[in-house]
């Protein structure tokens, strides 16, 4: 009879510190919204009452990067805007995550010219890519759910996994 069985008989729940910390991180993510183009409209739609991102622990959007732990880059990033994105990312406390929302944020989209960064991952490390032009709110919610799963697998030591790419939304609307 192991300690887990004895603890279970006494009504004691056993878990690891990593599980508890990661559960807290997933249920209290505070996003810094960085809407740069048409994807920002869909990002706002995801926070409306139809989809309600507060179900996922995102009650408030943060205007200050010092209070945020998730940056959602929605839209194309110009070369002039890239240092601002990097500065905001650097001001965020650890642990921090980035979602690239839309084709423009992921790979430059249809704007293949000198003025547009061909993917925000040239500026900041991206954890989840959400495809679409613009992606629907369901796709952003899928990306957030995938990020939650990724955070639950992380070690407290801070070693991060490789990025997740979402090509098709997991949630289907009828």
Swiss-Prot record:
Topology relative to the membrane: Peripheral membrane protein
Record's keyword annotation contains Translocase: yes
InterPro entries to which the protein is assigned, alphabetical: NADH_UbQ_OxRdtase-like_20kDa, NADH_UQ_OxRdtase_20Kd_su
A Pfam entry, by short name: Oxidored_q6
HAMAP family linked to this entry: NDH1_NuoB (MF_01356)
Alphabetized UniProt keyword annotations: 4Fe-4S, Cell membrane, Iron, Iron-sulfur, Membrane, Metal-binding, NAD, Quinone, Translocase, Transport, Ubiquinone
SUPFAM superfamilies recorded: HydA/Nqo6-like (SSF56770)
Catalytic activity, EC: 7.1.1.-
UniProt protein name: NADH-quinone oxidoreductase subunit B 2
Name of the gene this protein is made from: nuoB2
Function: NDH-1 shuttles electrons from NADH, via FMN and iron-sulfur (Fe-S) centers, to quinones in the respiratory chain. The immediate electron acceptor for the enzyme in this species is believed to be ubiquinone. Couples the redox reaction to proton translocation (for every two electrons transferred, four hydrogen ions are translocated across the cytoplasmic membrane), and thus conserves the redox energy in a proton gradient.
Similarity field: Belongs to the complex I 20 kDa subunit family.
One annotated Gene Ontology cellular component of this protein: plasma membrane
């Amino acid at each position: 009879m192991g300690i887990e069985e004895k603890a279970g008989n006494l009504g004691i729940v056993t878990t690891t510190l990593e599980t508890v910390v990661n559960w807290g991180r997933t249920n209290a993510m505070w996003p810094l919204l960085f809407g740069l183009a048409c994807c920002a409209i869909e990002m706002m739609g995801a926070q409306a009452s139809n989809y309600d991102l507060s179900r996922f622990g995102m009650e408030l959007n943060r205007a200050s990067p010092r209070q945020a732990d998730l940056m959602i880059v929605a839209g194309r990033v110009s070369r002039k805007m890239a240092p601002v994105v990097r500065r905001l990312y650097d001001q965020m406390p650890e642990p921090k995550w980035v979602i690239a929302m839309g084709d423009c944020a992921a790979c430059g989209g249809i704007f293949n010219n000198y003025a547009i960064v061909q993917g925000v991952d040239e500026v900041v490390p991206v954890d989840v890519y959400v495809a679409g032009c613009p992606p629907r709110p369901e796709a952003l919610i899928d990306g957030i759910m995938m990020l939650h799963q990724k955070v639950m697998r992380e070690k407290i030591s801070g070693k991060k996994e490789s990025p997740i790419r979402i090509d098709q939304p997991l949630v289907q609307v009828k």
